[in-house]
From Swiss-Prot:
EC id: 3.1.-.-
Binding site for Mn(2+): 96, 114, 116
Organism listed in the record: Mycobacterium tuberculosis (strain ATCC 25618 / H37Rv)
Protein name: Ribonuclease VapC15
Amino-acid positions noted as binding Mg(2+) in the UniProt annotation, renumbered to this chain: 96
Amino acid sequence: MIVDTSVWIAYLSTSESLASRWLADRIAADSTVIVPEVVMMELLIGKTDEDTAALRRRLLQRFAIEPLAPVRDAEDAAAIHRRCRRGGDTVRSLIDCQVAAMALRIGVAVAHRDRDYEAIRTHCGLRTEPLF
């Protein structure tokens, strides 16, 4: 399962949220956790100091880092955005569209705390694990 940035942020903030507990449980159970390159990028820019970035990099490298399929994921992300807009929902983040395109391409769900993924689920058939 792909874990979106929104879930990682909850986990890294050590909150007692549903998302934080869910990810902690998956890690403890040694479940498959997929980290898209763009999610890794977002998490590495989240703090300005290099020590925190290095800690996050080491944490994320324990999991499956999934590369983008450059042209295919870009085209599919644009199509997802257009389809959602035609359906009356504007996805706020193109990175969410890229993550969704990757998830659809590799056949996995996305765990998230972001309403954009539910719009994508509605219009594009993305499998999701909402953790609000």
